[in-house]
Amino acid sequence: MSNFLFPCNSTFFSALVSNSSRPGGGGGGGNVKSTISSAFISKLLGGGGGGGRNVSSFTDDGTIGLSSSSISYPGGGGGGGGSAKSLSSSKPGGGGGSPLIFL
């Protein structure tokens, strides 16, 4: 069923991979979890995760049969930022997801 909707050929696959493999932008800084005192603020900041890239178009050279506005492939989500659990430890961010490709 998926092969019928999205034909598998080298032009279509290479255009999709070249667009979806670009890195996402850097995420914003985390929020301060507590305001005990200004001396501890830097220890309570969580790092922001990288943004995922959305692939919304590709070049139609006549062999794919789909227009650039007719289909969208979402990119993987960025890793989550670390949030401080205490003054001495923090939770690391998660890894980014993979692009969804159905061929």
Swiss-Prot record:
Stretches for region Disordered: 69-103
Descriptive protein name: Putative uncharacterized protein YHR165W-A
Other comment: Completely overlaps PRP8.
Listed Gly residues bias regions: 74-83, 92-103
